[in-house]
C-alpha cells in the first residue's frame, strides 16, 4: 500500500513538473501569436517562476523577460501608429524585463556538473538591457512626478546599479555613461523624501566617486 501511495505521489510530482515546463513553452508561444493574450502569458510564466521544478532554470527567466519584451513592443507599436498606449506599462515592462534577464544570466553562469559555464543567453540579452536601460530613467521621472518616491527610487537605482553588473561589464558604463551622476542625484532626492538613508549614502558616494 505504501509503495502504491509513493508511486502515485511520484507520478503526480512528475506530471506537475511537466506542466510547468509546458507553461514556459506556452507563454512564449502565446506572445508570438498574431493576437497574443499577454495576461494569460504572464500568468503562465509567473507560475513557473515560483515553482520548484522550473524556478532555477535560466530559460524560465529568459522567457519571462521575452514576454515582457513582447508586451513592450506591442505598446510601442500603438504609439507608432498614433493609438492610445500606456507609458507606465512600457516603463514597468522594461523594468521587469531587465530583472528577469539579469536572473537568467545569474543562473546561466552557474557551472554545470563538469565545472563548465555555458551561458547561451548573454549574447542576446545584454544588448537588450542596454536598449531598455534608458526607460528606467523615464519611469523614474514619471513616478517622481506622480510623487511615488519609492517606485521612482527603484527605477533610478536600477539604472545606476546596471552599470556594474557582470552582464554589461564590457560596456564600462561607469566611465562611458555621463548621465549616472545626474540620476544618482535624483536617487538621493527621492530617497531623502522617504527617509531611506542607506540609499542616500550609497548614491551620494556614487556621485562623489564619479567627480
Name every feature range the model reports, one short phrase each:
Residues 32-151:
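Post-signal peptide N-terminal segment of secreted/secretory-pathway proteins
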Residues 1-29:
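Bacterial Sec-dependent N-terminal signal peptides
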Residues 63, 172, 179, 186-189:
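Canonical tetratricopeptide repeat
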Residues 195-202:
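Structural signature of tandem alpha-helical TPR/SEL1-like repeats
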Residues 47-50, 106, 161, 205-209:
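Conserved structural position within tetratricopeptide repeats
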Residues 19-23, 96, 131-136, 176-186, ...:
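Generic helix N-cap/helix-start motif at coil->alpha-helix transitions
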